[in-house]
């Protein structure tokens, strides 16, 4: 589907969901809330949104409201009406993929257990005002409860209402208390101006007839009075005064508009004013200003033609303005923008005396910002010492001839009164003459505007040489895609960002350039050139590209294509002046530095490797430092696994003469087994030139750190995957490579020269000193991956007994021997016979033959490797893993905090319920709380987490990663329905063991996230006391307010799209307690407050969706 057609269809869907139309300033926001994108009117070739809308009359009907606002309505389309209704109600983020080229990066996140979609400081602030527009809404009614830490609650039960705005301010401090805005004049003033204080939880309800019985009550949504603690005492709202900054900005805008009108004595259409404003002052005119002109008689005169036109005319202000002798100029306040006038006539009401109307008009003249109707009697009595007629207050419509009445939410008893301005004398004309005059004026101004546009188009060819191009903004997404163009060294890599606002926008611009330069006969090649000048170049295949002159010659010039980053010598006949219209897009070619390769950036071998692996290809990029030249890591995501390009290039330039090249049938002695994995894989160190040089460098590094004071420059300030650094273990420094960054505090590393992997704190790592860095990087990893050869096929999966026996026999033994039988270069594995010193070189007495003992391969039921000390259960059993002296694992275990080691429980049986943490705190029925939904199945079953506890859960998971990565292993029995720790995708979770399978897997339930997983039984370990303090965070929930016993897959998917991995507000209806904390259940209403001016009650949305779905079926 073409882009224009897709935009038209989505635009119709948005407009059809608003039967009263959408005002033009809000249309972009409504469109984005449905599609996730803005209306791309510029990409479609239109200078403004209004111009695009007027170009599609089959989709949009544009009218002007009574207040002068431009309102857009959908044009009926019978074939898509029903579909559009369903789409309009499903307000999820459906982002168009566009031209996507491998833009998704499966790189490990820096915070894998840090929740997605964390809310902003304030998810929603109703009434937020821009610089020039003041909120027209009165202060909402606030509900307050003393001493509440999770939310605010009134003395009566509040009903859930889908239109009621929900505010909240989330604080991550553990002991933060809730504050709620009180009834205070200054607070009211700030809230009215859009600078409202931010309470933790603030719900505003409105009456609704179809409410659940326990929540039925009637409280006005737009009541202009504050409700205090006992709901009895009320306080009137005071008038408000805009802040000084607002007044200063408004004065500047008024002066500018006055200057524009002085240049157009014959009038100007209000819809054209933003264009002239931006043309003269290089700034956008705030849309809120367009609604205030009728309140600025000293600036302009507003006239609406009666010939059926939809626009308004603005004239310069008349020299003689009505005098207001009683008005104090020092008390003048800028008026708020007028709301749509809602004149509500009252039939059968008594008329108001003319003298009262005159006094009301005179009184309102003193209040340029308007006066609340409820405050009128007191102001009237204070000024005239006469009581205001009660009938007049009940019948505000009777005052409509002397004042303008702005009703609040359609309530005839709540309104703001404004003084009416006298009409200009030249507007009192006869109908026919006025209509003809309006037509003549409109034609004249349209001709003038067309002439101005024509002159601008002609003057554009005069081309101002000093063209300013906006700088390129680095994408905000986590892993944008880039195209590598070329490089001179690894600190100077030319890239282009791939995406909608980058490469796609450039392609659209180049199409426009081709059309402009190919079809415009007035455009001719440039005659005079100078270095630095911007050009449009007619390149190969009739493409038009932006370029900048680097050097000049007689007939040729050297240019750099600013969107591609390469240079070329071209003839002058192909160079044209660049039209300013093509300078709004930033230059797309930019530079970056490859992280980890800075020290070798000029190495020709490295540059050659990087160039061969990257140039002309698209990669996902992790931006580490968003400086002028960003520091990045490139990832190739085209295959099944993500490949770290930086690390791959670094390994490709290692000194091959320092590698160990194993030969088939060769014997090697003095071999040290450094690591044995749970699948029987071994890592060995074979004596060689590289190992000797590495040991020598590590000794020099130790001496260097010993002699030199350790400063902050040697601490790791910017960890990233693939970075090689040092880790101090058992009194010596070892090389490690960062393999996964969990957070700013914890990460996973692999020992390059022993094959071990573990999790460490960032503070425990050190940078390699610069004097040794280049030599250290040149030495290849010295750990050789091996497998025992010729093992019987019947052995199958390695048992814990077999692994422990092998570790006990050869781990860290430095005088073993191996005989190589096969080398699999593709997998990087050597198949060997392994010998201890006593058995070398008899093949029948090798480790390969000894380990085939049948007793070691009996698969014991419900047995796995645990995190309990081996000596605790069987002191004399050598099958328990005891690491040899000097191993990295032993050093890590010894350095682990004593509090964790002491807390390890030596139980082979299950833990009792008394050892479980207390249940997580939930709000009571009728209260609300901030929650996060980590997983959702359907409205009848989803999981919530209390938002206030998320930070504590993140800290706990960091501690679990650090603890279990260095814990010892032993046999232990497992039982169903008991709590353990389990490793799932490189992270450790608190789990409930649900079932034990016969294939070595167990079914577990994540007690903090609510997910069910299958893991290897060896990855399950006891949950120690330290990790049993925090309550389990996952609480099963059910959506209240919907009646459906079975949910279709389609309905379940819609529900998941709206709630899963999102922060929401939950209004608790029922809490179902249970003895087991994981069996507790809560029935809640969910409210999505992420949209700027709309709260989505999920139960109402799902109910409407089911109704529409049934109609469609």
From Swiss-Prot:
Residues 876-1113 are annotated as: Interaction with CDK17. InterPro entries: LOTUS-like, OST-HTH/LOTUS_dom, SNase_OB-fold_sf, TDRD7_LOTUS_3, Tudor, Tudor_domain_containing, Tudor_TDRD7_rpt2, Tudor_TDRD7_rpt3. Residues 320-352, 873-895 are annotated as: Disordered. It comes from Rattus norvegicus (Rat). Component of specific cytoplasmic RNA granules involved in post-transcriptional regulation of specific genes: probably acts by binding to specific mRNAs and regulating their translation. Required for lens transparency during lens development, by regulating translation of genes such as CRYBB3 and HSPB1 in the developing lens. Also required during spermatogenesis. Its main location: cytoplasm. The modification Phosphoserine is found at residue 874. Residues 3-76, 249-318, 352-421 form the HTH OST-type domain. It comes from the Eukaryota. Residues 320-334 have a biased composition (Basic and acidic residues). Residues 908-1113 are annotated as: Interaction with CABLES1. One of its GO terms (cellular component) is chromatoid body. This is Tudor domain-containing protein 7.
């Amino acid at each position: 589907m073409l882009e224009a057609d897709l935009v038209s269809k989505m635009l119709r869907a948005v407009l059809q969901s608003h039967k009263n139309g959408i005002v033009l300033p809000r249309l972009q926001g409504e469109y984005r809330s449905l599609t996730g994108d803005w209306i791309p009117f510029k990409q479609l070739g239109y200078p403004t949104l209004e111009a695009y809308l007027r170009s599609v009359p089959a989709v949009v009907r544009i009218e002007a409201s009574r207040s002068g606002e431009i309102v857009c309505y959908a044009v009926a389309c019978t074939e898509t009406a029903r579909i559009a209704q369903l789409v309009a109600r499903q307000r999820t983020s459906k982002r168009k993929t566009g031209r996507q080229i491998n833009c998704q990066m499966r790189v490990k996140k820096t915070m894998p257990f840090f929740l997605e979609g964390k809310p902003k400081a304030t998810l929603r602030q109703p009434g937020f005002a821009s610089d020039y527009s003041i909120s027209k809404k009165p202060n909402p009614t606030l509900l307050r409860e003393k001493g509440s830490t999770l939310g605010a609650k009134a003395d009566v039960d509040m009903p859930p209402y889908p239109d009621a705005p929900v505010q909240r301010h989330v604080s991550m401090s553990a002991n933060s208390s809730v504050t709620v805005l009180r009834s205070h004049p200054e607070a009211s003033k700030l809230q009215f101006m859009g600078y409202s204080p931010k309470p933790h939880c603030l719900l505003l309800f409105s009456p609704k007839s179809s409410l659940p019985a326990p929540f039925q009550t009637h409280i006005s949504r737009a009541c202009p009075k504050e409700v205090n603690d006992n709901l009895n005492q009320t306080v009137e709202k005071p008038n408000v005064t805009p802040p000084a900054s607002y007044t200063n900005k408004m004065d500047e805008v008024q002066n500018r508009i006055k200057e524009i009108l002085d240049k157009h004595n014959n009038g100007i259409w209000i819809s054209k004013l933003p264009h002239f404003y931006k043309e003269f002052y290089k700034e956008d005119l705030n849309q809120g200003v367009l609604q205030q002109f009728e309140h600025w008689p000293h600036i302009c005169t507003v006239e609406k033609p009666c010939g059926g036109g939809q626009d308004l005319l603005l004239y310069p202000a008349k020299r003689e303005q009505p005098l207001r002798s009683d008005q104090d100029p020092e008390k003048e306040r800028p008026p708020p923008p007028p709301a749509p006038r809602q004149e509500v006539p009252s039939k059968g009401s008594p008329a108001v005396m003319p003298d009262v109307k005159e006094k009301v008009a005179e009184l309102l003249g003193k209040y340029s910002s308007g006066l609340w109707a409820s405050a009128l009697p007191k102001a009237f009595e204070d000024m005239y010492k006469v009581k205001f007629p009660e009938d007049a207050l009940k019948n505000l419509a009777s005052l409509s001839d002397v004042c303008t009445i702005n009703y609040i939410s359609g309530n005839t008893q709540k309104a703001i009164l404004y003084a009416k301005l006298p009409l200009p004398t030249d507007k009192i004309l006869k109908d026919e003459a006025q209509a003809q005059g309006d037509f003549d004026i409109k034609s004249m101004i349209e001709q003038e505007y067309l002439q101005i546009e024509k002159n601008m188009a002609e003057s554009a060819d005069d081309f101002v040489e000093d063209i300013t191009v906006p700088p390129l903004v680095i994408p905000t997404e986590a892993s944008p895609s880039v195209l590598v163009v070329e490089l001179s060294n690894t600190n100077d890599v030319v890239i282009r960002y791939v995406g909608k606002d980058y490469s796609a926008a450039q392609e659209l611009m180049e199409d426009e350039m081709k059309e402009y330069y190919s079809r415009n006969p007035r455009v001719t090649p440039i005659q005079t050139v100078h270095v630095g000048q911007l050009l449009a170049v007619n390149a190969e295949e009739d493409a038009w590209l932006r370029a900048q002159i680097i050097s000049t010659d007689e007939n040729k010039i050297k240019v750099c294509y600013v969107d591609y980053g390469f240079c070329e010598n071209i003839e002058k006949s192909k160079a044209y002046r660049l039209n300013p219209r093509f300078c709004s897009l930033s230059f797309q070619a930019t530079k970056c530095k490859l992280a980890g390769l800075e020290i070798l950036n000029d190495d020709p071998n490295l540059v050659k490797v990087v160039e061969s692996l990257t140039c002309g290809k698209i990669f996902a990029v992790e931006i580490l430092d968003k400086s002028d030249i960003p520091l990045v890591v490139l990832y190739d995501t085209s295959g099944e696994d993500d490949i770290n390009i930086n690390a791959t290039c670094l390994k490709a330039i290692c000194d091959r003469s320092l590698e160990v090249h194993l030969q088939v049938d060769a014997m090697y002695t003095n071999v040290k087994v450094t690591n044995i994995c749970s699948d029987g894989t071994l890592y060995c160190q074979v004596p060689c030139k590289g190992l000797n040089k590495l040991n020598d460098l590590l000794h020099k590094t130790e001496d260097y750190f010993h002699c030199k004071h350790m400063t902050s420059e040697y601490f790791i300030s910017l960890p990233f995957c693939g970075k090689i650094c040092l880790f101090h273990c058992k009194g010596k420094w070892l090389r490690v490579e960062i393999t996964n960054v969990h957070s700013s505090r914890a990460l996973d590393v692999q020992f390059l020269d022993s094959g071990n992997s573990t999790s460490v704190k960032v503070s425990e790592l050190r940078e390699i000193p610069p004097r040794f860095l280049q030599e250290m990087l040149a030495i290849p990893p010295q750990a050789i991956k091996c497998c025992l050869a010729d093992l019987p096929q019947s052995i199958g999966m390695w048992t814990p007994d077999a692994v422990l026996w092998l570790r006990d026999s050869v781990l860290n033994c430095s005088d073993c021997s191996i005989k190589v039988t096969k080398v699999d270069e593709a997998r990087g594995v050597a198949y060997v016979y392994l010998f201890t010193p006593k058995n070398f070189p008899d093949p029948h007495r090798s480790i390969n033959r000894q380990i085939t003992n049948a007793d070691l391969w009996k698969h014991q039921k419900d047995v796995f490797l645990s995190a309990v000390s081996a000596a605790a259960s069987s002191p004399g059993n050598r099958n328990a893993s005891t690491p040899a002296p000097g191993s990295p694992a032993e050093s890590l275990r010894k350095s682990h905090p004593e509090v964790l080691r002491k807390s390890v429980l030596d139980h082979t049986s299950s833990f009792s319920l008394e050892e479980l943490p207390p249940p997580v705190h939930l709000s009571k029925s009728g209260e609300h709380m901030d929650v996060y939904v980590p997983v959702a199945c359907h409205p009848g079953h989803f999981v919530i987490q209390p938002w206030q506890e998320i930070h504590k859960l993140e800290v706990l998971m960091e501690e679990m990663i650090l603890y279990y990565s260095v814990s010892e292993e032993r046999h232990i029995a497992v039982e169903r329905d008991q709590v353990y720790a389990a490793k799932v995708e490189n992270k450790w979770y608190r789990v409930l063991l649900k079932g034990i399978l016969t294939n070595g897997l167990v079914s577990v339930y994540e007690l903090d996230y609510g997910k069910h997983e299958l893991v290897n039984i060896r990855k399950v370990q006891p949950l120690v006391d330290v990790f049993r303090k925090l309550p389990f965070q996952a609480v099963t929930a059910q959506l209240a307010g919907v009646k459906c016993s079975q949910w279709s897959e389609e309905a379940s998917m819609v529900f998941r799209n709206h709630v899963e991995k999102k922060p929401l507000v939950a209004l608790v209806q029922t809490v179902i307690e249970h003895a087991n904390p994981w069996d507790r259940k809560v029935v809640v209403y969910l409210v999505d407050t992420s949209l700027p001016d709309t709260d989505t009650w999920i139960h109402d949305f799902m109910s409407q969706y089911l109704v529409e779905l049934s109609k469609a079926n």
